[in-house]
Amino acid sequence: MENRVVITGIGIYSCIGISLEEVKNSLYEGKSGIILDQERKEFGYRSGLTGFVPKPDLKNLLSRRQRISMGEESEYAYMATIDALKYAGISQEFIDENEVGILYGNDSVSQAVVEAIDIVREKKDTQLMGSGAIFKSMNSTVTMNLATIFKLRGINMTISAAC
């Protein structure tokens, strides 16, 4: 059998839209997803400007067990993957019967590390961090979570940078 890579779908969940149609319209209309976040200013950032991405509600889509190891970036990627699979016409049945893999880009993940350290400092107990803390802190957290949720058996890779 010949080895090949096939890109079949596209999905997006971003500060300028949470669907291809929304992103397209934002680009055509010159809309920005940048907001002034007062909390950033309170933390001492010189600029309060940031991209605002609405947090998806996954309670009706995934079990608590599936959600516990997902940071925000995994949640956004999950929503984008759902759209990409729909766009491509790929069902879970197809995924179950074939070697399907994913490739995601994800940079350093620091929020989970900061939150875990805060818990340890406050409570003086590492057990209170929770079982999902280590998975949320990995650069490969997106790919790991999605490969598990969708039961992918192909090659799953994360493209990551140091900073």
Residue ranges of each PLM-predicted region?
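Conserved "HGTGT" condensation-loop signature of ketosynthase/thiolase-family condensing enzymes
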Residues: 1-155
